[in-house]
A protein has these predicted regions:
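Short S/T/G/P-rich N-terminal loop/turn motif that feeds into the first structured element of a domain
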Residues: 1-68, 72-92
């Protein structure tokens, strides 16, 4: 069964380019270590909810945007190994 790591994060709007650069750097490494797919989605049309929504989930402030992303792996074992490799790979420290 496939395994997915999902993320919802608040990113200051002025840091959008830096976030995109970081994501573009990390995605090929995740794929090298076994990820099938890496998806990054910068919020465009995220309406405010009444009970909950993406902005409330991450306590986004007015100057922040929501990013929804996920990494798909063939299994949890591959995901666990990939995360270990990512944490120790010197390219992630550059």
């Amino acid at each position: 069964m496939k395994y997915v790591d999902g993320f919802v994060v608040a990113v200051p709007a002025e840091n959008k380019e830096a976030y995109i650069a970081m994501a573009a750097k990390a995605a090929p490494l995740f794929k090298e270590f076994g990820a099938l797919r890496v998806v990054e989605c910068w919020a465009d049309d995220v309406p405010d909810g009444k009970l909950t929504d993406f902005r409330m989930a991450v306590k986004a402030q007015d100057h922040e945007e929501v990013v929804f992303s996920w990494i798909e792996f063939p299994s949890k074992e591959v995901r666990d190994a990939a995360n270990q490799k990512m944490m120790s790979d010197p390219r992630m420290k550059e």
